[in-house]
Design a protein with these regions (language model features):
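Bacterial lipoprotein signal-peptidase II cleavage site
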Residues: 35-43
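Short beta->alpha transition motifs characteristic of CBS
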Residues: 110, 166, 186-191, 266, ...
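N-terminal secretory signal peptides
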Residues: 1-17, 27-31
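Twin-arginine (Tat) signal peptide motif
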Residues: 14-20, 177, 338
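Core segments of cupin and vicinal oxygen chelate
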Residues: 58, 68-107, 223-266
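Vicinal oxygen chelate
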Residues: 71-75, 122-179, 226-230, 279-343, ...
Length: 373
């Protein structure tokens, strides 16, 4: 097991820690009596006692964005703008940043054509973002600063002016969870633009060609497939302090911030690598028949109530019943696939993953709703 000092040395050599942070971290290790060998490791590989804390070490507040890798970037841009009317808030070279709602949330469409279309990563945002400090915290929790974003590894990308960043580089921090699912961490003001925090986007976003058919206000949640649910939950909760106030049967809802947003970590037997299964977006005036009609007119095949899609450009609804924490008559959950088969969910702005027809009835940490048995 790599020691605390070894992790700091790796981060410093990879230029993911500045000299001041590096020396301060060494001093903190010396004060707490941590040694440079494996005997200093705790049983769970963490060194949370190194820094006194009153809350989670990385207190994320909101979902910030997702990046899509697509087969035809120009076609996907036209398709998403036609459906949602999202303006362009920024450009990162060929990558296009589509503003979600009033921002700073966004969907990024990668500029290079891909033969593996997917949600490449999701981003969580926190106040007072400091990439050096977060790299250190991740290292203290077993995520090594290797300059890569594989399983339990972190890297910092300095996005320069050629990619729409600051002259000295806009730091963007990525890390892989135990299954290799990539998460990005940024400041709450991050909109995918220039500036040291990525907060400097177009003063007037480039409008979409048309108004779009559906108005999206924000991200609602992501569902992630993992090989070991308890292991993944332990890391996410230890790093971010995500509390469970609601269950969908056996599936816990990890609340992000104080609103409706959440992450759902679904344990899937036989999964060798993690997967961001789908993203959910919040819309006003949620009505299944109305949305089906709009999607059908946009060229999608409506499957009705179904267990899933079997190809691109399909839409269906799943009625989540009491056995999965839903309403007695079923909580409608509407999904569609984009031109590449990427799965997107649409829910009412009140949806919190809970009971009730709109999934709006959630519990508290002390008294969670929806749990089986």
């Amino acid at each position: 097991m790599e020691s605390d000092i070894d992790r700091l040395m790796t981060a410093f050599k990879n230029r993911q820690l500045g000299r001041r942070t590096f020396l301060g971290s060494l001093a903190a290790l010396a004060v707490t009596g941590c040694s440079s060998d494996d005997s200093s490791d705790t049983s769970d590989g963490s060194t949370e006692a190194t820094l006194p804390q009153t809350g989670p070490p990385i207190p994320v507040q909101t979902i910030n964005h997702m990046t899509l890798s697509v087969s035809d970037p120009a076609a996907s841009l036209a398709w998403y703008q036609g459906l949602f009317g999202m303006p362009i808030a920024a450009r990162q070279a060929e990558t296009v940043v589509l503003q979600v709602g009033d921002g700073p949330q966004f969907i990024a469409l990668g500029g290079a054509a891909s033969d593996n279309p997917r949600i490449t990563h999701l981003c969580l945002a926190l106040d007072n973002f400091d990439h050096e400090r977060i790299v250190q915290i991740l290292a203290e929790n077993g995520v090594a600063a290797t300059g890569q974003s594989g399983p339990m590894q972190s890297r910092v990308r300095m996005r320069g002016e050629d990619f729409g960043g600051a002259p000295t580089g806009t730091p963007e921090l990525y890390f892989g969870d135990p299954d290799g699912v990539v998460l990005q961490l940024q400041d709450s003001s991050y909109c995918g633009g220039a500036g040291l925090l990525g907060e400097d986007c177009l003063a007037i976003p480039e409008p979409a060609p048309g108004e779009g058919l559906l108005a999206v206000s924000e991200f609602n949640h992501f569902t992630i497939f993992v090989s070991d649910q308890q292991r993944s939950m332990e890391l996410y909760q230890r790093l971010f302090g995500l509390e469970v106030d609601t269950y969908q049967g056996a599936l816990p809802v990890l609340r992000v911030g104080s609103g409706k947003q959440f992450l759902a970590l679904a344990g899937v037997p036989g999964v060798s690598t993690g997967l961001i299964h789908h993203a959910s977006l919040a819309v006003g005036d949620f009505d299944v028949d109305r949305i089906f009609s709009l999607l059908e007119g946009y060229g999608l095949t409506v499957l009705g109530e179904a267990p899933g899609a079997n190809g691109p450009l399909q839409a269906y609804v799943s009625m989540r019943g009491p056995n999965r924490g839903g309403a007695p008559e079923g909580t409608p959950e509407l999904y569609f696939t984009d031109p590449d088969g990427i799965l997107i969910q649409l829910q009412d702005v009140r949806y919190c993953g809970g009971n009730g027809y709109f999934g709006e009835e959630c519990g508290t940490v002390e008294n969670p709703t929806g749990r089986n048995g």
